[in-house]
């Protein structure tokens, strides 16, 4: 009888330990193609702000995390199909996306900007920052000026992004919008002269402009708010409320300990933490 009880107890403890192991395994989807948020080095290893932040958050959550590479245009579908449990891929928190998935609190602020080649007719446009959450008279004037400047121009963007949505919204008229699978392809065609301008996350396009060795310059406003969202956060399935809570608590801890600021300064060159 004693042996039987010990056997049952051993099985019970083993089941508990096994359950905890599985409960603490988290798969995080990332693109690996959007520096400095997430990218790969020459040896193919994932690097970037979010790669290091993911590792820190997983330590705070006491979780064993695996990074799963996913093309950008399949990022949200992949989450919903349970290919991974969370998204950390420079994804802006927008009302449109929140109809489909949940987001953690933001961990980094972002904006968007146009980039052109030096000497372009679009170079030197008004660089006033505009927040599209509040379309006051000054913002409306800037949008009208942009509509005039972009008329007849080809603007290149990564597909399935807030940047594509903005250009196709009618807020800046109807420029020709050319889409690409990755931001790298946008950058290559911009330099090759197949785009009059590229629109992207300001941190990503600045990183390219500074490191490409090409005469790429930023022009026009820095866009934020409205269709550009409220910062970047972790994307999580609607029904994973416990995981959402764990990520939020881990982000709080990382912020309090200065880890997010440290990583932002390392990868962005300034403190873009939220």
Residue ranges and their predicted role:
Residues 9-19:
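Bacterial N-terminal signal peptides
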Residues 63, 92, 103-155, 160:
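A conserved helix-loop-strand patch within extracytoplasmic ligand-binding domains
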Residues 73-77, 90-100, 165-170, 184-187, ...:
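A ligand-binding cleft/hinge motif common to bilobed small-molecule-binding domains
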Residues 32, 109-113, 202-249, 251-274:
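Periplasmic-binding protein-like
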């Amino acid at each position: 009888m004693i042996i039987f009880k010990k056997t049952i107890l051993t099985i019970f403890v083993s089941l508990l330990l096994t359950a905890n192991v599985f409960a603490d395994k988290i798969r995080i989807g990332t693109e690996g193609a959007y520096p400095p948020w997430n990218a790969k080095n020459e040896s193919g290893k994932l690097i970037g702000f979010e790669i290091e932040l993911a590792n820190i958050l997983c330590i705070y959550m006491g979780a064993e995390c695996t990074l799963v590479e996913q093309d950008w245009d399949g990022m949200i579908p992949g989450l919903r199909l349970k290919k991974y449990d969370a998204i950390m891929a420079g994804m802006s928190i927008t009302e449109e996306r929140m109809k489909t998935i949940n987001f953690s609190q933001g961990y980094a602020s972002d904006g968007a900007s146009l980039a052109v080649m030096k000497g372009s007719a679009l170079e030197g446009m008004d660089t006033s920052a505009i927040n599209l959450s509040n379309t006051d008279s000054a913002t409306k004037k800037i949008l009208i000026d942009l509509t005039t400047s972009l008329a007849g121009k080809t603007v290149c963007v990564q597909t399935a992004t807030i940047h594509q949505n903005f250009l196709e919204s009618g807020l800046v008229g109807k420029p020709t919008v050319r889409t690409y699978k990755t931001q790298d392809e946008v950058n290559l065609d911009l330099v090759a002269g197949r785009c009059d301008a590229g629109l992207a996350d300001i941190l990503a396009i600045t990183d390219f402009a500074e490191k490409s060795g090409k005469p790429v310059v930023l022009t026009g406003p820095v866009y934020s708010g409205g269709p550009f969202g409220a910062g970047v956060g972790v994307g999580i399935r609607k029904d994973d409320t416990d995981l959402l809570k764990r990520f939020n608590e881990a982000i709080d801890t990382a912020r309090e300990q200065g880890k997010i600021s440290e990583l932002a300064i390392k990868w962005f060159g300034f403190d873009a933490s939220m």
